[in-house]
Every structure is written in C-alpha cells, then in structure tokens.
C-alpha cells in the first residue's frame, strides 16, 4: 500500500456518512470496470478498507475513511487559461459519460434537495421572516433582486420529467480536478461526496460558476466579476464532446438554464446564511457571506448580460 489520505467526514453537512462512502464506493467500482474496458482513462479515487474490512470507521463520534493518495498531481483554485478550462471540463464530461449507464437511483441522496432552487428560495424567505440577527433591513436591495428571478424556479419546474435523471458529481469546481504535474493533463476527478441523482445542467452550471470569473467567489471587486467568454467557450467544448453519444438535445439546451441557475442559487444560499447568522458556510469576518452573495449575483448578471453570445456557444456545440 502506498501513501494514504486519512479524512474525517463532516457529519454536520453529511449526517449519514456511511451512505456517502457507500455511494462513492459504488461509483469507484463502476469506473474501475469502465477503465478496464478502456472506456475511462482517468485515475480513480480508491477507498482503503480498515483491518476489519470496513470503508469507514467511527472513533469517539467522528467518522473517518482512508483514500489512496494520487501522486504527481496538483489542483487549481482559479482557472488560468482556456486550455486549462477545456481540460478540466473534458474530465468532468468523461466522468459523466462513464456513469451514463449507471443507475442514478442507486445513489443515496446524501444532501436532500441540494440543487432544489424552489426550496432554497423558501429557505431565504424563512430566514427573512425569522430575521434572527437583525440583518434583513440591510439587504432589501438583494432581496428584491432575488424575488425578481422567480422565473428560474418556473423554468426548472417546466423541465421536470423532460430530461433524464443522471448520476451527477454535483460539485464540479476546478479544485475538484487533479492535473498531472508532468504535462498538465487531467489526472482525476475527485471529491465524490456529493455524487447523487441530478441533472447534467447543474454540473455544467457549477463549472460556469467556478471556472468563468477571474475573481474568487468572495471578491468584492464586483466590476471585475464577469464571465470570461473564452473560458466559457472552452468549457462548453470540453464538457459536451465526451457526452455527444449520450446527451439529448433538450439536455444540451438546458445547459443555458444551468449557467444562470448555479451562480444565482449559491448567491441565495450565501444570503440566507448571512440572515441566519452564518451557521453553514465558514466565514472570515461578519460580512463574508453577504460579500459572497453579492459576488455570485454579479456573476449571474454577467451571464444574463452575455446571453446572446454564450447561449449560441451551447447551441452550436
């Protein structure tokens, strides 16, 4: 056995850690079959069993697991180039393609309603009504803006039952991709903790959210928070190419909705947490979640402002 990563699972976020590990193990086994058949070329996160042959163990109310370390690799926090965006998006596309014949319903929903925008909007309104820490008076502009975007909820509802449920990664950030330190190629898709049944539009939208802005998601330089068109074009090409044999036309068209929904939804979640007293997302200072919300709303506005160009890139892919 080589180097191992020992990890404590966050049971506040994942109240049923054994289900999380079971999901990840199912995906690991499926990908190993695909790799052996030459249908998946990336490295695979491998769970290491304990001496008693368990893949997670409890020690004093904490749940731990061990994963095989993937060497000669590095991660990125901000996308540096269109080439890098295409490489990462292609890896996430290969991951999705390898799982297209995996039963999405065999995955346990470890975080219920994770990408349920209607529920996220309801949670925001509950936070407004409770006004636990007296912050509602300071965010009327943001609240008005959120309420004006209700059409996104309606558009998602209209899609229900018309596009297939897929096994999704649900956290397709650039830092959940490992690059080779030798040639900058894609090495592995990591962090399978949120793998659940979902829609590919959410994975696409999360890449838009985390790849396209040149600024970090808590940057207060809102005039610089914008969608870099070359990065967007690269991720569209990279993600869709491996999926061409599997994706429906309606699914591909839904990616435009995903590009809008994901920055808006995480903005709603940051704003909700700000009004609730910062209980979910870790903060570095009192206004941190509000700054994050403003940042994500600025990114959403940038997506919408560039609709004509960005939508065409998806349609023509």
Q: PLM ranges: what are they?
A:
Residues 252-262:
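Small/polar glycine-rich anion-binding or flexible loop at a beta-alpha turn
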Residues 201-245, 261-280:
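Active-site activation/catalytic loop segments of kinase-like enzymes and analogous catalytic loops
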Residues 52-57, 154-155, 271:
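A short, acidic/glycine-rich surface segment
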Residues 7, 14-18, 70-86, 101-169, ...:
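ATP-dependent phospho-/nucleotidyl transfer catalytic cores
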